[in-house]
Curated annotation (Swiss-Prot):
The gene is PCC1. Component of the EKC/KEOPS complex composed of at least BUD32, CGI121, GON7, KAE1 and PCC1; the whole complex dimerizes. This is EKC/KEOPS complex subunit PCC1. Belongs to the CTAG/PCC1 family. Gene3D superfamilies: Alpha-D-phosphohexomutase, C-terminal domain (3.30.310.50). The lineage of its organism: Eukaryota, Fungi, Dikarya, Ascomycota, Saccharomycotina. Keywords: Activator, Chromosome, Nucleus, Telomere, Transcription, Transcription regulation, tRNA processing. It holds the Pfam family Pcc1. It is found in: Nucleus; Chromosome, Telomere. Component of the EKC/KEOPS complex that is required for the formation of a threonylcarbamoyl group on adenosine at position 37 (t(6)A37) in tRNAs that read codons beginning with adenine. The complex is probably involved in the transfer of the threonylcarbamoyl moiety of threonylcarbamoyl-AMP (TC-AMP) to the N6 group of A37. PCC1 functions as a dimerization module for the complex. The EKC/KEOPS complex also promotes both telomere uncapping and telomere elongation. The complex is required for efficient recruitment of transcriptional coactivators. GO terms for biological process: tRNA processing; tRNA threonylcarbamoyladenosine metabolic process. One of its GO terms (cellular component) is EKC/KEOPS complex.
Length: 100
């Protein structure tokens, strides 16, 4: 599933990130949750997200490395909130690691 894709020759910087999830459903939920976010400056940035198996794949194209860095930071902040919501609604207890 692609959330938003804009092709422009000026978008010469590109980065792709792959975020693994516990299940295919979680990756799909994350992808769908990111889809409403519109890019305000589409001439400077393109972001596309899709889920594949248990992975969320986000591809960024931008006019500069700074633009991409800010976009990635924003997506990661949004993903943090999405994951916290999934954890809360899933009702799983936190795993606490102890030394053996």
């Amino acid at each position: 599933m692609t959330t938003q894709t804009i092709t422009d020759e000026k978008l010469s910087h590109q980065v792709s990130i792959n975020i693994p999830f516990e299940s295919e459903k979680q990756a799909s939920i994350a992808c769908n949750s990111l889809s409403p976010d519109l890019i305000l400056r589409s001439t400077e940035l393109s972001v596309s997200c899709r889920s594949s198996d248990r992975n969320l794949i986000c591809e960024f194209s931008g006019s500069s490395d700074r633009v991409i860095r800010v976009a990635i930071s924003s997506v990661i902040d949004n993903l943090k909130t999405i994951i916290e919501c999934m954890d809360e609604f899933d009702a799983k207890e936190d795993v606490i690691f102890t030394e053996a």
